């Protein structure tokens, strides 16, 4: 996946010849980046990456040159409820902001990937806008969505 998309700054944790100087991954205030204990995140991919590469990956998913239409539909068909206003499917999550709070009813929905350490790559199809962030801490998974809502509220006020 990395080579065809020219994601030169992405690799699998612990399977890289020369580990780069990566940001810390914090769990209860302890930095786990140099410990061989991050196998807990293999369901999230165990990938070290940059926000630029996350954007490259999300754009590749959206432009239709990376997956078949059928697989893309399966990935974006988020039927299972994760939490209020948050749904998931085959590798993707969908955020219905009007369901999260009636005060967010005018905010367009987004979908994409979200990790346990507060990292996300999300796409607003209606506005053709990508939202990418990485908070690097297990304690920021929920906080990252709160911050996304704040960012979206500012972004939605900007006239382009």
Label the predicted regions:
Residues 18-19, 115-117:
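Short acidic/glycine-enriched loop/turn segments that link adjacent beta-strands
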Residues 19, 128-131, 141, 145:
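Alpha-helix termini
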Residues 78, 97-100, 140-160:
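Short, gly/Ser/Thr-rich active-site loops of penicillin-recognizing serine hydrolases
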Residues 51-52, 97, 118-124, 142:
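Residues at secondary-structure transition points
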Residues 1-110:
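Short, surface-exposed loop or secondary-structure junction motifs
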Residues 110, 117-130:
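Short, surface-exposed beta-strand/loop micro-motifs that present aromatic residues
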């Amino acid at each position: 996946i990395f080579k065809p998309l020219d994601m030169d700054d992405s690799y699998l944790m612990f399977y890289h010849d020369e580990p780069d100087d990566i940001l810390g991954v914090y769990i209860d205030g302890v930095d786990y980046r140099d410990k061989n204990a991050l196998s807990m995140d293999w369901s999230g991919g165990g990938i070290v990456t940059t926000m630029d590469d996350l954007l490259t990956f999300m754009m590749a998913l959206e432009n239709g040159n990376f997956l078949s239409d059928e697989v893309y539909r399966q990935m974006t068909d988020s039927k299972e409820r994760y939490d209020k206003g948050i749904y998931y499917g085959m590798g993707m999550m969908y955020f219905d902001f009007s369901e999260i709070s009636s005060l967010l009813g005018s905010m367009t929905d987004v979908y994409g990937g979200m990790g346990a350490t507060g990292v996300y790559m999300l796409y607003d199809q209606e506005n053709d806008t990508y939202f990418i962030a990485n908070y690097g801490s297990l304690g920021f998974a929920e906080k990252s969505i709160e911050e996304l809502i704040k960012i979206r509220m500012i972004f939605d006020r900007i006239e382009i």
